[in-house]
Amino acid sequence: MGEDGHDALHAAGPGAGRGTAPGEGLREGPEGRGLHGEPGGGLGGGRGVGRGEAPLGGGPGEGPHGDLREAAPRGHSGEARCDDLREAAPSALREDPGEDPRGDLRWGSIAGLVRDAATRYAGHEAVVDGRTRISYAQLGERVERAAAACIAAGVEPGDRVAVWAPNTLEWIVSALGAVTAGAVLVPLNTRFKGAEAAYVLQRSRTRLLFVTGTFLGTSYVASLRRAAAEGPGSGPLPALPLLEQVVVLADDAPESFRTWKDFLAGGDRIPAAAVRERAGSIPSDAPSDIIFTSGTTGSPKGAVITHAQSLRCYAVWSELAGLREGDRYLIVNPFFHTFGYKAGIVACLMRGATMVPQPVFNVDTVLANIAAERISVLPGPPTLHQSLLGHPQRDHHDLTALRLVVTGAAVVPLQLVERLRGELHIATVLTAYGLSEASGIVTMCRRGDPAEVIAATSGRAVPGTELRITDRHGAAQPHGTAGEVWVRGHHVMSGYFEDPAETAKAITPDGWLRTGDVGVLDADGNLRITDRIKDMFIVGGFNAYPAEIERLIGLHPDIADVAVIGITDPRLGEVGKAYAVRRPGSTLTADDLIAWSRREMANYKVPRTVEFVTELPRNASGKVLKRELRARTRT
């Protein structure tokens, strides 16, 4: 599991997950089984969506798993938990001890958070995007105008609205506008090709899409039109009959598409009172977003997360990280990923920090932005921070404003933590772990933890979270024993969107999320991720799933069989290697297949090397023996 990206950097390739805790992964979900009997709890079971549809989630069973406060205390067998924020972050570490960490109870919905921030931080700088600078009051006005346009376009509460664009002010405004109108946000990975985006749009039954014009030399509009040009629909993309409108976040758009300016103008007839009434009617347990994460089946699945889950999780994240009013936050983690969106946009709204979105990871640009904008907060995968430390021009830039780094999604060397603290004098360096299915955050180190704990572990459970290390039968294991990491708490997704079978595989009847990761809990409750049960590997912080890559490569007419594994890479941590069997008579070369793959899939999925073989090793049941391929690679 995991998001496609916990936070990936564009240069590193996208993906998601496992490190989302800032680290989706920095790059970067189950169940709505919220705290039993608490206000804003009971987050599970999905919620009825627009137009009389069935619940969004597909959770197995509806019964609560009990009040987490009665669960076994930390130290019992291989379980750890944390319910009280004061236990998680002692008062000595709290920078604002009077603030209520229950963001779900404070704001109710993301729409409520946006309006509160627009009032509370009205004159503070909210977003810096190139030469554009806007205050929180101006951001609130823009979001309300976008919400009005969504309502004018026919968006109803529960409808899915997608955004396919890089980190920009327009992403922030369009996404928050859709959510304020009561829609369920569906972020699309900017590394997707047209067919990949079309699949998610079709699977989520998206009604409205916001899309960038051209990004990194690719016309997203042209890519979509090629992939969805033929079909039964009468809308802008015939192969997607439920997609009623496509809005291009630019000044021009092809026929049957709308420009951003035209779309916004359409909402001018909607009274502000109507927008605020719509926003104020959003229940806290209503779905706020669906994060699609690829799985070992090769087909993306949508983790449904509620407003209450997002607000509670990232109020806690902000508290534990020490994010504060006046911080200036360079958001390199993609907005399409849980971490970029929620530990970025949502957290900044909560604390009044300034968002400085960066659409593409480029070390020179990052260094320049840190110096010019006096950046104080810089989450990202380890590759980002290693690139900064190793840059030959580093000392020519003023980096003294940096005070907070959150990382994860990959192995974090002790030397990296020590260098960030020692050479850049960064006061707070933290690591964390999460996955899309658990709202992107499960564990997190605490300010004040020694460098050895920060580098070797992903920290302790965040408030309201239970962790269990299990054997293959689901029995809890003692401290120090490796097993699968199971998670239970208020942040577990409401289920995979309209997929009860996959939801039942992911979540036990009593609410435990099977993460598919192998980990160890130490006596202090710190979690160390040691392996992955699945074959997933992480490319620069983006989760890459062999089954999905194999399915795509298998579409090549000259490929008879293929298996993909992750291999070590000095820059990205891991990259893919494909073992492929050519069809008889084929003269396909490795370079040919790699070039073809770059045209057909997101670049982080593209194998960096290809080895042709006469056959793949298989066991008696026909399953490919990937351990043999890994052993072959090591020799």
Regions found by a protein language model. Name each.
Residues 102-106, 110-115, 120-168, 172, ...:
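Conserved AMP-binding/adenylate-forming core of the ANL superfamily
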